[in-house]
UniProtKB/Swiss-Prot annotation:
Pathway named in the protein's UniProt entry: Purine metabolism; IMP biosynthesis via de novo pathway; 5-amino-1-(5-phospho-D-ribosyl)imidazole from N(2)-formyl-N(1)-(5-phospho-D-ribosyl)glycinamide: step 2/2
Record InterPro entries: PurM-like_C_dom, PurM-like_C_sf, PurM-like_N, PurM-like_N_sf, PurM_cligase
Record-annotated disulphide pairs: none
Molecular function terms from GO: ATP binding; phosphoribosylamine-glycine ligase activity; phosphoribosylformylglycinamidine cyclo-ligase activity
Gene3D superfamilies with a match to the protein in the record: PurM-like C-terminal domain, PurM-like, N-terminal domain
HAMAP family recorded: AIRS (MF_00741)
EC top class named in words: ligase
Keyword set includes Cytoplasm: yes
Main location: cytoplasm
Name of the featured protein: Phosphoribosylformylglycinamidine cyclo-ligase
Lineage: Bacteria, Pseudomonadati, Thermodesulfobacteriota, Desulfuromonadia, Geobacterales
PANTHER family linked: TRIFUNCTIONAL PURINE BIOSYNTHETIC PROTEIN ADENOSINE-3, TRIFUNCTIONAL PURINE BIOSYNTHETIC PROTEIN ADENOSINE-3-RELATED
Length: 348
């Protein structure tokens, strides 16, 4: 008796589905291309020409990130076409704070079973994020891993590389006492604090994914899947004409943990909590979860996605420019002298 022949598909990996997926995403990827991209996807590596004539002393800046448990909301809602925007945002927003223009992006998608249409929806979001950031999607990896993930769940990671002239690197070292802090409004929770948000909204409040959030007139899915704002083009615009001493991306750790990452010794940030309107979703989470204010400011962005430290004399012109770029911005505080051993961020 002959033994039954076993295929890779029998083991849970469908090569044909993978090929269909690649065909679906090729036009999405091509739409993000830049002149420096030298090859289409499908090769063993992505090719990108860093023109020697364009830069004098270029420094490459890299970043990698994921979207955490925001993915759980996408699973529950069965909506996958915007989570890729979050993935790009988390990476490119990290490198723009050092003054780097994102050049290209790569993604990693791992799933128990690859459904080409669903996978293409995910990459549609990645491509949209790349368009918003002005970077090219030059490659990626899609791993079908049967038995590794529960049900139809998946995980994602993103990788970006950008460039900045060495003498234009922003590292916070030029931040000085008297600088003003400008906060750029976030679009919502962005991609941080979702484990706490889900616990409060779904466990404590008992809301389902399609239920309307009290006082917001939006469903849980609509509110929590709002894409992370990408600030790249606005900040690049500012950098061409203004002096920016430091930039902090307000991600996990909130204002309290991220602003200190750019502060030089002897400086602290004094942030006035009354200078911007905290979005209702954060107030709801705080009230329903009985969460202390300190915990909120070290978990969520609380309405501020980026903080810029700028010379006082340039504040008004920067605010005018940001308004023209469709950014909502607030002067949220200033840089003050800090004694050794004191907190780097003072909320007043």
């Amino acid at each position: 008796m002959s033994k039954a022949r076993i295929t890779y598909k029998d083991a849970g990996v469908d090569i044909d589905a993978g090929n269909t997926f690649v065909k679906l995403i090729k036009p999405l990827v091509k739409a993000t291309s830049r002149p420096e991209v030298l090859a289409d996807i499908g090769g063993f590596g992505g090719l990108f020409s860093l023109s020697s004539g364009k830069y004098k002393n270029p420094v490459l800046v890299s970043g990698t990130d994921g979207v955490g448990t925001k993915l759980k909301i996408a699973f529950l809602a069965d909506r996958h076409d915007t989570i890729g925007i979050d993935l790009v945002a988390m990476c490119v927003n990290d490198i723009i704070v050092q003054g780097a223009e994102p050049l290209f992006f790569l993604d990693y998608l791992a799933t128990a079973k690859l459904y080409p249409g669903k996978g293409a929806a995910i990459i549609k979001g990645v491509a949209e994020g790349c368009l918003q950031a002005g970077c090219a999607l030059i490659g990626g990896e899609t791993a079908e891993m049967p038995g590794f993930y529960a049900g139809d769940e998946y995980d994602m990671a993103g990788f970006t590389v950008g460039v900045v002239e060495r003498d234009k690197i922003i590292d916070g070292s030029s931040i000085t006492v008297g600088d003003k802090l400008i906060g750029l409004a976030s679009s919502g929770l962005h991609s941080n604090g979702y484990s706490l948000a889900r616990k409060v909204i779904m466990d404590v409040m008992g809301l389902g994914i399609n239920d309307t959030i009290p006082g917001l007139d939006k469903s849980v899915a609509d509110e929590l899947l709002t894409p992370t704002r990408i600030y790249v083009k606005s900040i690049l615009n500012l950098l061409r004409d203004f002096t920016i001493h430091g930039i902090a991306h307000i991600t996990g750790g909130g204002l309290l943990e991220n602003i200190p990452r750019i502060l030089p010794n002897g400086c602290k940030a004094v942030v006035d909590k009354t200078t911007w309107q905290v979005p209702e979703i954060f107030k709801l989470i705080q009230n329903a979860g009985n969460i202390e204010e300190q915990e909120m400011f070290r978990t969520f962005n609380c309405g501020i996605g980026m903080v810029l430290s700028v010379p006082e004399k340039e504040v008004e012109e920067i605010l005018i420019r940001l308004s023209g770029l469709n950014e909502t911005a607030f002067v949220i505080g200033e840089i003050a002298k800090c004694d050794a051993g004191t907190e780097c961020v003072e909320m007043v």
